[in-house]
Amino acid sequence: MSDEITNGAAKPTEAISGPTFTIEKIYIKDVSFEAPNSPAVFNEAGQPELQLNLNQRVQRLNENAFELVLHVTLTCTAAGKTAYVVEVQQAGVFGLFGLDQHAIGVLLGTQCPNILFPYVRSLVSDLIQIGGFPPFYLQPINFDALYAETLRQRAQNEKEGSQISSHPAGNA
């Protein structure tokens, strides 16, 4: 009798058939914290202003592997001076097997950033606190809505581009 317990998942040596999504690796690609006006900025009164910039980049590594990098820059200013700048590039390598292009696009545009975002949130918060500033927590981001908006804009741009090219340059 075997002491091995299985939960119905495929054993590593068994071939997995059908569409498959795997997380191969999650890692920090780049991280930076700058507080150029400390310690003077700690005494600034007033409400700080925050500017968040978020984007993602996808690179195909091979037929079934993709690297997604979630890049976040958070800049805090107080009384017109930069209090801090946090920059994080959190990356992951994801395996996408047996999926069509549409499904790959959806996973890379929604599921992969949703997997990476908690790592970004934690790292940004920790860096800010270690830097001597009050905690800041990145609020949840609806990557599904962002992906849908990107598709809508892309379709609109293609539609406008085809309308422009379908009109003659001039009439004689």
Swiss-Prot record:
PANTHER family listed in its UniProt record: PROTEIN-EXPORT PROTEIN SECB (PTHR36918:SF1), PTHR36918
One annotated Gene Ontology cellular component of this protein: cytoplasm
The protein, known as: Protein-export protein SecB
Subcellular location: Cytoplasm
Keyword Protein transport attached: yes
Coiled-coil annotated residue ranges, if any: none
Highest taxon, organism lineage: Bacteria
Keyword Metal-binding among record annotations: no
Sorted UniProt keywords: Chaperone, Cytoplasm, Protein transport, Translocation, Transport
One Pfam match: SecB
